[in-house]
Structure formats: structure tokens, C-alpha cells
Amino acid sequence: MKRLLFPLLVFLTLPSVLHSSHSNNQGELVVTSESTRESIELAKYLKDNGVVKYSAYWCPNCLNQSELFGKQAYRELNVVECARDAINSQTQLCIDKKIKGFPTWEINGKLILGVLSLKELSKLTGFKN
């Protein structure tokens, strides 16, 4: 257990040595792409169905995932911020859920690690537009 927990704790504190152009100086992810009607509908569906994205504001893959949705749709998602130094950090929840990397999606109680296309998310959750 200690062998798994230590790398996670190091990973969660890594942003103190990183500077990222996709985050602001307040520890928040900054999404710049525009959303489509479909991505907004999907984001609302995911939120309404309890889907959660575990993320870290300094994580490049998290930004890539968020940019697929666009800034308007991103605001609709249930996002748990795992970085210890972030605004609204929920690090303990991430540890309790055994989040091993970012982004991680929780869909129907199952954790899925990695960037997922909107099509993949639709298929995994039963979303039909």
C-alpha cells in the first residue's frame, strides 16, 4: 500500500515545481476552445448522470480532455480537482477513490483513466444526441 500511496502523493504535489501556461496563477484550469451544442448537451447529461472527472489543473492531458468539451460545456461537468495547491482542492477524495492518474473518469462506479473522445464518453454512458 505504501508503494502505491507515495507515488500518488508525489504526483499530487508535483505542480509546486511546474509552471503551466494552461492554468492561471490561482490554480485553476483555463479552457479556451468554444463548445458545440452537442458537447454542452453531453456535459449536462454526464453531470445529470453522476459522471465525475478527476483532474489536476496543471495536467496537460486534463487540458486536452477539457478542450474537447470547450469552455461552456466544461463548466457543466462534475470535476473533482485533485491537485493539493488548487482552488477547491479535494485531494483527500482523490486519495480515497484511489485515483492513480489524470484525467480519470468515474462512470457508473468504474474508474477509467485517460483522455476519452466525446464519442467514447457518449458510448460509455448511453448518451444519444
Regions found by a protein language model. Give the residues of each.
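Structural microenvironment flanking redox-active thiols in thiol-disulfide oxidoreductases
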Residues: R84-L93
